[in-house]
């Protein structure tokens, strides 16, 4: 197939074209990004250095924090730098790389959240066999499945996009490169391809969301004969995960489970699931988890002690 395109770069509209608001955007998203990096890396360091946090749940949480770090980094730095640029330019290859990064890390996180729900199910419904079932080798395999799934999803999406004829215009009505805004710039009819993107992206969101719902329905049914105290204790194990699932899945389903249409609210939704959710994940897991908070305090005391020495 011959690659036909005249466009070598794209111009991003950004979040706002108001100079004052662009300065506000710079400050706000720089702070958000710094909190995201520090929070997620703190989780990674805390779990990897603490012997008390060696269960499969924390193994998965480490990988979730790593994914959140790189996922946010696929769009936040460009948005921050562009806040001071009158003309927000991104090369064709850079645009495709950004779209690819967004989809590989986003899809991997979706699958990993589903894996974490299955871990939660085993912990609550089969506690006596938990360590036997959730062996370290199985945990590694499940994380590998998440990454392979994300890789296949993103690769299929981008291979269909990179060969499309972009003849102009080259102005993307977004602050980052994403498939739906890009498809609006293609010189041919993209209705069929748009349906494929919706099916591919929407399917991975919806399928994993349904698996999550089924997992929690089974968990709730298994707890119906337990005491109220027992139910509360069991559910507290997974409530943080439920919050993260809702925060991440609802915006993704809203954006991708529809035809090739872009709405004014899409940019705000994209900010939420690419920057706000990765920032909130460490907060959600830390505030509701006494073991993580205790490990962070021990890590901090160890650092203070070493500094004093």
From Swiss-Prot:
The gene is OR4C12. Residues 48-55, 119-137, 218-233, 288-309 are cytoplasmic. GO terms for molecular function: G protein-coupled receptor activity; olfactory receptor activity. It comes from the Eukaryota. Keywords: Cell membrane, Disulfide bond, G-protein coupled receptor, Glycoprotein, Membrane, Olfaction, Receptor, Sensory transduction, Transducer, Transmembrane, Transmembrane helix. Its main location: membrane. Residues 1-23, 78-98, 157-193, 257-267 are extracellular. This is Olfactory receptor 4C12. It comes from Homo sapiens (Human). Glycans are attached at residue 6. Odorant receptor.
